[in-house]
């Protein structure tokens, strides 16, 4: 029973960290990555489709993304969707493909991005603490129901805290890595 609670908690904490990593992939660092465009939806024949389902995305250079639509009629809707995305990118259209050149980030913009990264990391830590609280509540309920002894509860609470500490350290590690990437000129 105790192992189930701790195992379940670890799974949820792992998902929180994975969610943070996915969020960080969407952050612009001055280096081109197709994940910047993951949230862009294109009006494709009456339905909203993700950009990668209507075009081929490529990164020919460090700060350039090319978008080659499978249907040339999709160039205008793709261009419009990118302009409306608040990514601060200006698409250049040559009739067959769209080029996105990522401008270099200013020092001020880098600092703003780092502040946002820290906010996201703090939200992830709050989520981890909430998961820890839920696990401890479940353990206390087991003890109250006499399913586990007080000693087992104390041992399990220590395991929960150790696991939480290790997951918080992972969040800090992910933050530090992304922070370095953003501040790198």
Curated annotation (Swiss-Prot):
Gene3D superfamilies: 3.30.1360.40, Ribosome-recycling factor (1.10.132.20). It comes from the Bacteria. GO terms for molecular function: ribosomal large subunit binding. Keywords: Cytoplasm, Protein biosynthesis. SUPFAM superfamilies: Ribosome recycling factor, RRF. Disulfide bonds: none annotated. InterPro entries: Ribosome_recyc_fac, Ribosome_recyc_fac_dom, RRF_sf. Pfam families: RRF (PF01765). It is found in: Cytoplasm. One of its GO terms (biological process) is cytoplasmic translational termination. One of its GO terms (cellular component) is cytosol. Belongs to the RRF family. NCBIfam families: frr. Responsible for the release of ribosomes from messenger RNA at the termination of protein biosynthesis. May increase the efficiency of translation by recycling ribosomes from one round of translation to another. This is Ribosome-recycling factor. It comes from Geobacter sp. (strain M21). The gene is frr.
